[in-house]
Regions:
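Residues embedded in well-ordered secondary-structure elements
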Residues: 9, 32, 102-104
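Generic structural signal for beta-strand residues in well-ordered domains
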Residues: 13, 34-36, 106
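Sec-dependent bacterial lipoprotein signal peptides
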Residues: 1-20
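N-terminal segment of the mature soluble domain
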Residues: 36-91
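Solvent-exposed, acidic/flexible segments
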Residues: 46, 50-54, 104-106, 130-138
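A generic local structural motif
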Residues: 2, 27-31, 75-78
């Protein structure tokens, strides 16, 4: 009977762990593959909590050899983005900081991140998230865009 309880507990723990994990960020639109030389992103951060998101996003992308440039959040609509060298525009919209921290000390946020392909002007990612760590979000975002790079 003890062994059955342990197996049952292990199965319940496995389901609990699996349900808490967030999956990969998927492309909502179509984007053509890019060359490694095109690994350039332009980022617009909403001013609130921008330092935290800037640090995490730069770490996630620069560790994967992406070039990260910034533009003022309020200048995005005015700028002629097609004349820039970057391939993608990442807009980190207003974030809501949750009241609690993770086990390892990370900060949880809820909000929205949009990614636009500057070659076509199309939105390729619209990621609404709730109660996730900023570093986890930026890492999955870097992996999603990294999937477009051809070798």
């Amino acid at each position: 009977m003890k062994i059955i309880k342990k197996i049952f507990l292990a199965v319940v723990m496995l389901f609990a762990f699996a349900s808490c994990m967030n999956g990969p960020i998927n492309l909502t639109g179509s984007a053509a593959p890019i060359n490694p030389s095109q690994k350039k992103v332009l980022v617009a951060y909403f001013p609130e909590y921008s330092a935290k998101w800037r640090d995490d996003l730069e770490l996630s992308f620069e560790s994967r050899k992406w070039k990260v440039n910034e533009i003022d959040f309020w200048e995005v609509e005015k700028a002629n983005l097609r004349k820039r060298n970057e391939t993608f525009l990442i807009v980190v919209d207003k974030m809501i900081k949750e009241d609690y921290k993770s086990f390892l000390g990370g900060t949880f946020f809820s909000g929205n991140i949009s990614v636009y392909d500057l070659r076509t002007g199309n939105k390729i990612i619209n990621y609404n998230f709730h109660t996730e760590e900023s570093f986890d979000v930026t890492t999955r975002l870097a992996k999603a865009l990294g999937g477009l790079v051809t070798k």
